[in-house]
Swiss-Prot record:
Cofactor(s) named in the record: [4Fe-4S] cluster
Co-factor binding comment: Binds 1 [4Fe-4S] cluster. The cluster is coordinated with 3 cysteines and an exchangeable S-adenosyl-L-methionine.
Function in brief: Radical SAM enzyme that catalyzes the addition of the adenosyl radical to the double bond of 3-[(1-carboxyvinyl)oxy]benzoate, leading to aminodeoxyfutalosine (AFL), a key intermediate in the formation of menaquinone (MK, vitamin K2) from chorismate.
Keywords: 4Fe-4S, Iron, Iron-sulfur, Menaquinone biosynthesis, Metal-binding, S-adenosyl-L-methionine, Transferase
Name by which UniProt lists this protein: Aminodeoxyfutalosine synthase
Biological process annotations from GO: menaquinone biosynthetic process
InterPro entries membership: Aldolase_TIM, CofH/MnqC-like_C, Elp3/MiaA/NifB-like_rSAM, F420, FO_synthase_su2, MqnE, rSAM
Molecular function via GO: 4 iron, 4 sulfur cluster binding; 7,8-didemethyl-8-hydroxy-5-deazariboflavin synthase activity; aminodeoxyfutalosine synthase activity; iron ion binding
Domain of life per record: Bacteria
Catalyzed chemical reaction(s): 3-[(1-carboxyvinyl)-oxy]benzoate + S-adenosyl-L-methionine + H2O = 6-amino-6-deoxyfutalosine + hydrogencarbonate + L-methionine + H(+)
Family the UniProt entry places it in: Belongs to the radical SAM superfamily. MqnE family.
The keyword Isomerase appears for this protein: no
Source organism (scientific name): Streptomyces coelicolor (strain ATCC BAA-471 / A3(2) / M145)
Length: 387
């Protein structure tokens, strides 16, 4: 990128002018990560100061039985297959209550698209979880799951959301987005929920007063132009509804996915390494610069590793997710080398060591507690050469 284009993009960002598709592609083509990260950090600081948000949450994956066979997924199993499981609701409640003494604030629930579970299983599970943990927010179900519920129940998404909200739902999850462009999506997704239905369901959720996250799965067969298109679709929907709280880039776990036979899956598997740390940081930076109307950008440490997550905080991200606890969707792929859980103290140390001030939030991004910032005497900055 020549100096003139750099100055033009800097001026746009600093004046608050919206970046275009062409600008986004130009940013991805830049090989000056320090400049790109610095520009994204300016925007992140303007929106969120020196704060990094986190929460104390527990992920629940109540079934891995799924009708779909998406090319990127090692979580799903078919009915009767080895390692297929479906929890009784009582089991899920027991797992959730095991964290009761840790000031849990959120349950994050994502499942496979089970062909035989009745629709009533899902609102009942929310009601029983809410009854057991009334102070805990329930963030549950992807738009793909809501679309699946339409199929198995014969109900509309609007009526489904109404019943789930009545049962205690406070937010959808952001999954099922992957990459929206059909050029890529047709090769990686094996279900019927594409942009039209994904956006329809999140639009409905926003109309009903729910705030939701949105995601992008990157680092597989997509190109930078597909990432730019993905973010711009979300940005346009955010212009319309204002309902997205946070954008979450998710790094695809290449090395650990057990792909099945077939041309498409071999095409995915052909790239034997994950997106590099530098590519991950560039993705966070460009996302922060393009997605100007979303308040927060989250780095999900489970899918990036804690050191890359710390560096992402200096490249546009301002949220480090939470304690997580047993995220099967990634860890079922293989041992990715990240823990199943970080304690509150772990998160505080990681945030401070990256040079930021930790703030504990709830699902709605309401501040629960502010902590002191980094101690210069003990700060251990993340090392770029380890990314």
């Amino acid at each position: 990128m020549d100096a003139g284009l750099k100055r033009e993009l800097e001026q746009k960002v600093r004046s608050g002018e919206r970046l275009t598709r062409e600008d986004g592609i130009a940013l991805y083509e830049s090989d000056d990560l320090a400049w790109l990260g610095g520009l994204a950090h300016e925007v992140r600081t303007r929106k969120n100061g020196d704060v990094v948000h986190f929460n104390v949450n527990r992920h629940l994956n109540m079934t891995n039985v799924c009708t779909a066979s998406c090319a990127y997924c090692s979580f799903q199993r078919k009915p009767g297959e080895k390692d297929a499981y479906t929890m009784r609701i009582e089991e899920a409640v027991k797992l959730a209550k095991a964290m009761e003494g840790e000031n849990l604030t959120e349950l994050h629930i994502v499942n496979g698209l089970h062909p035989n579970l009745p629709w009533r299983y899902y609102p009942r599970s929310l009601r029983e979880l809410k009854a057991a943990l009334p102070e805990v927010s329930l963030k549950a179900f992807t738009a793909t799951e809501i679309h699946h519920f339409e199929t198995i129940s014969g109900m509309s998404a609007s009526d489904i959301l109404d019943e789930l909200i009545d049962a205690g739902l406070e937010s959808l999850t952001g999954g099922g987005a992957e990459i929206f462009d059909w050029e890529v999506r047709q090769h990686i997704v094996d279900h019927r929920t594409h942009w039209e239905d994904w956006s329809r369901i999140h639009r409905l959720a926003h109309e009903k007063g729910l705030k939701t996250p949105c995601t992008m799965l990157y680092g597989h067969i997509e190109e930078p132009r597909h990432r730019v298109d993905h973010v711009l679709r979300l940005r346009e929907l955010q212009d319309e509804t204002g309902g997205f709280q946070v954008f979450i880039p998710l790094r695809y776990q290449h090395d650990f996915v057990d792909m099945k036979d077939g041309k498409v899956r071999n095409r995915l598997q052909a790239r034997t390494q994950m997106a590099t740390g530098a590519e991950a940081l560039k993705t966070f930076a460009v996302s922060r610069l393009l997605f100007d109307n979303v308040p927060h950008v989250k780095v999900f440490w489970v899918m990036h590793g804690v050191q890359t997550a710390q560096l992402a905080l200096q490249h546009g991200a301002d949220d480090m997710d939470g304690s997580v606890v047993e995220y099967k969707i990634t860890h079922d792929a293989d041992d990715f080398g990240t823990p199943n859980k970080l304690t509150r103290e772990d998160l505080l140390d990681l945030i401070r060591d990256a040079g930021f001030r930790p703030v504990e939030r709830n699902t709605r991004y309401e501040i629960l507690r502010e902590y002191e910032g980094p101690d210069p005497a003990r700060r251990e900055s993340p090392q770029p050469m380890r990314v």
